[in-house]
Amino acid sequence: MAKTLRKLLVIVIALILLAIVAGVVVYETIPSSNTALTHFDTIIVLGTPAEPDGTPSPEQRERTLEGVREYKAGIAPTLIFTGGPAHNQFVEAHVMAILAESQGVPATAIVEEGRAQNTIQNIFYSRRIMEEHNWNSAEVVSSPSHLPRTALILEHYSFPWKTHAAPWPAEYSLWQRAVHYTVEAESCLKLRIFGFPQSRFLLHATN
């Protein structure tokens, strides 16, 4: 009996390790772009919830500031901040836009997308804005761990895109970063195996 239990334990551990390895491989091999372009029509900065008092959260701050740096570096002449009031009453796009303007970005270079409730909708609504302005390419800025899943969504679109990582917030520990990577790697593995759930926001993602 003890011998059988040991064998089962070994099998379980082996399966867990295999799943971890598979997750890492899938996560690390997701393409980060579909183009060789280095300059784009716009920079899409993906939202994340603000603090309960409406101030930028650490990741929201870093994503915004990186978008601003890319804008000032001439990567694109415009910024789309995307994200609605998904997890509290504050519209993520508006919080980020205010921060960007405080860093010297003119309001005329900013478009706020304030409806999206998740990453799929971030891309869907941002693409609509691009079409309205005849913008054909985009650099997409988000937190490092979030970008592979974002790329899986972007693969539904044929316009030229590239993902770009914002720095981790200085206040995040290595453990916090590891947790973010682990959660996202697991999510990407599931999406590679089972695909995305049916969604009208992906159904029409053909351009």
Language-model regions: role of each:
Residues V24-Y181:
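A structural signal for short, hydrophobic/glycine-enriched beta-strand patches
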Residues A205-N207:
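Hinge/cleft segment of the Venus flytrap/periplasmic-binding protein
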Residues K7-L8, T64, L191:
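Hydrophobic alpha-helical segments, especially transmembrane helices
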Residues A2-T35:
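N-terminal type II signal-anchor transmembrane helix
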Residues L174-F201:
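A transmembrane-helix-recognition feature enriched in membrane-embedded lipid enzymes
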Residues K3-T4, Q60, H146, S187:
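Short alpha-helical segments used as structural interaction elements across diverse proteins
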